[in-house]
Amino acid sequence: MFHFTRILAAFLLPTLCFCGYSTAPSSTVSIDNSLIGEPEVVCETASISLLFKTRNSFNGKVFVKGYVSEPSCMTVGDGKTGHRFEVRHDSCGVRRQREINGVVISATVIISFHSIFITKIDRAYRVSCFYVEGTKKVHNHVDISALTTQLLESETQLPVCRYEILNEAGGSPIKYARIGDQVYHKWTCVAELENVYCMKVHSCTVYDGQGGPPVTVIDANGCSVDGVILQNLEYTSDLTAGKLAPVFKFADKAGLYFNCQIQLTIKDVNYGCSNTQPQCPTSQYVVEPAQKTTETAEPYPYDSHESGYPTRPANYPVASSRYPIPTTQAPASYPSSPAPPPPGADIDNGYPEPQPIYIAETPENAYDGIVGFNDTEQPFTTSAAYTEDGVYSRLIKRNVVESTEQINASNKKRPVTVGDIDLPERGILVFGLEEMEDGETTNAGDHGATRALREARNSQEKTCFSTSRMYFTLILLCLLFATTVVVFIVIVQKQRQILAQTAFFKP
């Protein structure tokens, strides 16, 4: 029994020593410095400053996130404890976000205590300043003949406007989407008074949110710039507009941030909101009419006449008593048209005399071969300029009567603008083509981006669950091993006590 106890002790002693060595805490070296209190943000006219103090001298670096390589966006500590880091509004990718009463300018500043690497004691701060647009009211009064004119003012609340990106018309707002998904852009204004205001959406831009240049999708007139991205808007009411459009994205950028403006005008009593709402062309190409109309004279075909003009050759006989043929003849002249001879002149030059052409006022027109006629044209006379070796061209002057739409357009008044609102921007996160699975289909009630986000979360939850399960199993094995060691130690102690009490060891 004593021999067995010695063997067991010799076997467990290295194991206990190894466990004691492996569980000893490792020594690390950390930077002996930290921030004192919270940094202070100073909003200036053309820049944002961050003031902070450190416990010891600071020799690290302070920079704007994403712009550490630019000298104007990064500074190195000078060994002091008090520091000031300044970022200008027009540099380092500083973001501008329009609000109803002003603009928010923000940037992410990182304070690193190491000159090269980012360590766990470093801090990152989202620095933002809100600049309020100041308003000032000016009052004045006029005294006339000792009578004081009192200024009476009446104020009414302007409509409250908003811009939303929905998964469908009448749907719910979204924050995630995929390339090719259909989203609904909606602009609405809510007014206290009905049938008073009209709205026009204009000057819409989109940018990536990372300092890239904005791209115009709706111009200043409220018309679409690129029909592939966003077509002309549909105004369903006086204060509501929207359009269904496919989702797109910038190259290598996941964010899309839209910014639009809304012009509010007074509704016209006669024409409603037609003066305010944009009249955009349905096509990207505009066909303009020619400034002049020309006519070409050629030998007249007796079989058919398809020129469209109520004219005939000068020598064409008229088989009707309603249109008499003059007996005089015109002198020969080419290429210009001669004036008709005076009445009674007897001139014989071999050329047929020009005949006056009239437009019938009744359907019983003797010109049966003419295809259509224009009742707005005045009677005119053709000349004997039709020759075999020449072409005669002349201008045709028509008295065109303006249409009702043209008259109404000229009588319309310019709408009275009461405000031009810069709406807060709206952004969505777009999943790229490389993140789309092959053969994936989108259900009617399940948005593609929402499903993608849910799948990503499920995968993350599964990974976290597997990691937690592994940790739990490892802890359980350690506890089991420790329990086994304790049991062996207790058994060894009991055996020693039993052996010490036997008579074999007594003197």
Swiss-Prot record:
Which residues are noted as glycosylation sites? 374, 408
- Membrane found in the keyword field: yes
- Provide a Gene Ontology MF annotation, just one: structural constituent of cuticle
Q: Which residues lie on this side of the membrane: Extracellular?
A: 20-471
Q: What happens when the gene is disrupted?
A: RNAi-mediated knockdown results in cuticle defects in adults, where the external and internal cuticle under the alae are detached. In addition, alae are present, but they are shallower and often have two or four ridges rather than the three in adult wild-type animals.
Provenance organism: Caenorhabditis elegans
The highest taxon in the source lineage is Eukaryota
Identify the stretch(es) annotated as Disordered: 292-350
| Stretches assigned to the ZP domain | 42-280
Signal peptide start-end: 1-19
State its role.
Plays a role in alae formation and subsequent cuticle attachment in adults.
Residue intervals passing through the bilayer: 472-492
Q: What is this protein called?
A: Cuticlin-4
Give GO cellular component annotations, separated by semicolons. plasma membrane
Q: Name one Pfam family in it.
A: CUT_N
List the ranges whose topology is Cytoplasmic. Answer: 493-507
The record gives the membrane topology as: Single-pass type I membrane protein
Q: Which gene encodes it?
A: cut-4
Keyword line: Cell membrane, Cuticle, Glycoprotein, Membrane, Signal, Transmembrane, Transmembrane helix
Q: What broad class describes the main subcellular location of this protein?
A: membrane
Where in or outside the cell? Cell membrane
